[in-house]
Amino acid sequence: MGRFIFLSFGLLVVFLSLSGTGADCPSGWSSYEGHCYNIFHLFKTWAEAERFCRKQVKGAHLVSIESSEEADFVAQLVSENMKRYGIYIWIGLRVRGKKKQCSSQWSDGSSVSYQNWIEAESKTCLGLQKETEFRKWFNIYCGERNPFVCEA
């Protein structure tokens, strides 16, 4: 009887410890701070990638990076999974308007509170650059086709 109680308690502890991890993410997606992330090795324009993300999971968009900790998580995830693909990865931020100002919102509607530019240029979409280990934001022509990260 004592062994049964010990085993039951052990299973309960394991279940409770897993309930706050990736259990809520779809299969193949990675979990971080209550959000789910997936890298797609498909080469799409920024707009195509955003549309693709929206079709994957309810509430999904191109990734919005809102802290240095999240930037580190995304960089590690991309580095581990993009060893032989392109040099840029789309993120959910683009420049809008006649003055080419950076939008104050990510494609998911959240405010831009963290920035990590490598340099500012006249190109209107943003991605992570391989040369910076996918940690810095780089301006890229929106019609270029690149892999991307979706976040839900």
UniProtKB/Swiss-Prot annotation:
Main location: secreted
Keywords noted in UniProt: Blood coagulation cascade inhibiting toxin, Calcium, Disulfide bond, Hemostasis impairing toxin, Metal-binding, Secreted, Signal, Toxin
Xref: Gene3D superfamilies: Mannose-Binding Protein A, subunit A
Coiled-coil stretches noted in the UniProt entry, renumbered to this chain: none
Pfam families recorded: Lectin_C
Single GO molecular function: metal ion binding
SUPFAM superfamilies reported in the protein's UniProt record: C-type lectin-like (SSF56436)
Annotated C-type lectin domain residues: 32-151
Record-linked InterPro entries: C-type_lectin-like, C-type_lectin-like/link_sf, C-type_lectin/snaclec_domain, C-type_lectin_CS, CTDL_fold
Disulphide-bridged cysteine pairs: 25-36, 53-150, 125-142
First and last residue of the signal peptide: 1-23
Annotated binding of Ca(2+), by residue: 64, 66, 70, 151
GO cellular component, one term: extracellular region
Function text: Anticoagulant protein which binds to the gamma-carboxyglutamic acid-domain regions of factors IX (F9) and factor X (F10) in the presence of calcium with a 1 to 1 stoichiometry.
More about this protein: Calcium is required for ligand binding.
Similarity-based family: Belongs to the snaclec family.
Protein name stated in the entry: Snaclec coagulation factor IX/factor X-binding protein subunit A
